[in-house]
Amino acid sequence: MTKITSDDVRKVATLARLNLPEDLIDTYTSQLEKILGYVAQLEEVDTEDIPPTSRAVEVTNVLREDIIQETDIREDLINLAPNREGDFFRVPKILSE
């Protein structure tokens, strides 16, 4: 495995647009080297008989079909608004021209 240098960490930080404090560069260098060591260990694991997957556990869709229901609460909801104009909610302006 290639040795990670402080310059490597600075370059990665620049590419990631991170502003790393200079006094922590050595700490991050050591941590990044350990992480890459773990990745190297994972590369040695035999995965020949393991099927490719995108998740560690099986995921099923638990959503239900939408049910359209007629309701009479439109006016009640509009009346709850602190500020309205006719059938519309009035909200503070957030964009300028």
UniProtKB/Swiss-Prot annotation:
Keywords: ATP-binding, Ligase, Nucleotide-binding, Protein biosynthesis. GO terms for molecular function: asparaginyl-tRNA synthase (glutamine-hydrolyzing) activity; ATP binding; glutaminyl-tRNA synthase (glutamine-hydrolyzing) activity. One of its GO terms (biological process) is glutaminyl-tRNAGln biosynthesis via transamidation. Allows the formation of correctly charged Asn-tRNA(Asn) or Gln-tRNA(Gln) through the transamidation of misacylated Asp-tRNA(Asn) or Glu-tRNA(Gln) in organisms which lack either or both of asparaginyl-tRNA or glutaminyl-tRNA synthetases. The reaction takes place in the presence of glutamine and ATP through an activated phospho-Asp-tRNA(Asn) or phospho-Glu-tRNA(Gln). This is Aspartyl/glutamyl-tRNA(Asn/Gln) amidotransferase subunit C. Heterotrimer of A, B and C subunits. Its EC number is 6.3.5.-. InterPro entries: Asp/Glu-ADT_sf_sub_c (IPR036113), GatC (IPR003837). It is an enzyme of class 6 (ligase). NCBIfam families: gatC. It comes from the Bacteria. It catalyses: L-glutamyl-tRNA(Gln) + L-glutamine + ATP + H2O = L-glutaminyl-tRNA(Gln) + L-glutamate + ADP + phosphate + H(+); L-aspartyl-tRNA(Asn) + L-glutamine + ATP + H2O = L-asparaginyl-tRNA(Asn) + L-glutamate + ADP + phosphate + 2 H(+). Belongs to the GatC family. Gene3D superfamilies: Glu-tRNAGln amidotransferase C subunit, N-terminal domain.
